[in-house]
Each structure stands twice: as C-alpha cells, then as structure tokens.
C-alpha cells in the first residue's frame, strides 16, 4: 500500500497580510461571503473561523457554501465533526491548480469541520481527517483551537466578534501565499476598514 506523506504540522507563522471589516447585518455577511466565493484560489484552501458561540460562524459558512453553488439544506457539523458538500462550478470557475487535476472540473469538494466537541486526538487519524486536509478542495474549520497541533497552517483565518450594535467585527489574517492572493482579490470586491488596509499594506511590504 502506498503511504501518504503529509506536511509537518508546525506553529502558526506571522501573518503575511491582514484586514478587517464591519458587517452591520446579515445582508453584509452574505455580500462578504459572495465576494470570497469569487476567489479562485479558495477552491483549494483551508480557512479557519474563530469566534465565541453565537458569533455567526456557521451562518457565514452557510452563505459561503450557497455562494459557491452548494444546493439544499446545509447542516451544522457540530455532532458529526465534519459535513461534506459538493458544489457544481461552471467551467470558468474550475479549480486553477494542477493538484486538482484528478477532480471533475465542475465539482468542488468542500469539508466543513466543527471541532467544538472534539476531544480525542486518535479520532483525527482514525476518521481520516488528516487525509481530508491533504485532499484537494475547500476545507473550513470552526473551533480549530480544539484540534490545535493536528491541523495544517490555515491559508486564511477569520475572527468574528459581535460588536456593541449587534453587528460583526471581522479580522482576516493570511498565513500563506495562497491566502494572501485570496485576500488581495477579496479587498478589490469588499473594501476593508481604512485602518486595516494600512495594516495590510504594512504587513505585505516585506
């Protein structure tokens, strides 16, 4: 049997870029998700979502998956840990990287993880989660801190916080060149707060 060699999981590096947004309501959450869904590099990326209970992580994921083309009811993976999805893409939105050559050009595989109740490191191996993270497609994880040390470096980290007006303050950090490409494309469609753009430019000048 051929063995699969996975990248060594190391500590999180310094961000390559960062930006922040304010979602005043769910409509703006949906608009942000639609802008993110248009980034081709997202189709083979790993995204972490951080935030307290009720911050809106699962709501955002539902908007993102619908924007990517997932149809039907989108269940939360809280009890199952992971929910797989398939999105049908038009040929112009086919995954751009050679590593996705084995996938149908019109099907995007998506795995939505929720590690809130995860407490057994052995399950990570036995359930095949490591293989899923090494597979082509989009991986999204809520409560990644519950599986810290077992997960790869995230391309994007989105921290969602409830603000005083019941909107959402969102900070996005990128930790890989792929994540930076996604962020740069996202900023063209969904301008960030002015102070975060300055922080982003400062972070990406090196």
Pin down the residues of each PLM region.
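Short phosphate-coordinating micro-motif centered on Lys-Gly-acidic
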Residues: 2-14, 19, 119-125, 130-206
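Phosphate-binding P-loop
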Residues: 38-44
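Conserved lysine of the Walker
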Residues: 57
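Intrinsic disorder/low-complexity segments
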Residues: 94-107, 202
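Short beta-strand-centered segment that lines the nucleotide-binding/catalytic pocket of NTP-utilizing
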Residues: 70-85
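Hydrophobic anchor at the beta1->P-loop junction of P-loop NTPases
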Residues: 47-49
């Amino acid at each position: 049997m051929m063995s699969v060699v996975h990248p060594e999981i190391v500590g999180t590096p310094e961000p390559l870029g960062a930006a922040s947004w304010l979602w005043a309501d769910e409509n703006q959450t949906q608009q942000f998700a639609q802008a993110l869904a248009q980034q081709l590099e997202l189709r083979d990326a790993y995204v972490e979502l951080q935030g307290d209970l009720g911050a809106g992580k699962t709501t955002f994921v539902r908007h993102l998956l619908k924007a990517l083309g997932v149809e039907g009811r989108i269940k939360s993976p809280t009890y199952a840990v992971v929910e797989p999805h398939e999105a049908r893409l038009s040929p112009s939105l086919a995954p751009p990287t050679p590593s996705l050559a084995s996938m149908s050009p019109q099907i995007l595989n998506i795995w939505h993880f929720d590690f809130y109740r995860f407490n057994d490191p052995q399950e990570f191996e036995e359930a095949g989660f490591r293989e899923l993270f090494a597979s082509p497609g989009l991986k999204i994880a809520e409560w990644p801190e519950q599986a810290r040390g077992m997960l790869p470096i995230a391309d994007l980290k989105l921290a969602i916080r409830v603000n005083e007006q019941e909107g959402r303050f969102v900070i996005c950090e990128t930790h890989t060149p792929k994540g930076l490409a996604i962020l740069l494309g996202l900023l063209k469609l969904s301008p960030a707060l002015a102070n975060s753009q300055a922080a982003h430019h400062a972070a990406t000048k090196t």
